[in-house]
Amino acid sequence: MNQKHLLRFIKKSYQVDADRVVYSTK
């Protein structure tokens, strides 16, 4: 896995976690 793809994967998973946190907080 190259670094660019890994970074994109981390960014995506981070965004999903952020959405989950926002959803849980409501």
From Swiss-Prot:
The gene is AMPD1. The keyword Hydrolase applies. AMP deaminase plays a critical role in energy metabolism. Its cofactor is Zn(2+). InterPro entries: AMPD. Binds 1 zinc ion per subunit. It holds the Pfam family AMP_deaminase. It catalyses: AMP + H2O + H(+) = IMP + NH4(+). Homotetramer. GO terms for molecular function: AMP deaminase activity; metal ion binding. Keywords: Hydrolase, Metal-binding, Nucleotide metabolism, Zinc. Pathway: Purine metabolism; IMP biosynthesis via salvage pathway; IMP from AMP: step 1/1. Its EC number is 3.5.4.6. Belongs to the metallo-dependent hydrolases superfamily. Adenosine and AMP deaminases family. This is AMP deaminase 1. It comes from the Eukaryota. GO terms for biological process: IMP salvage.
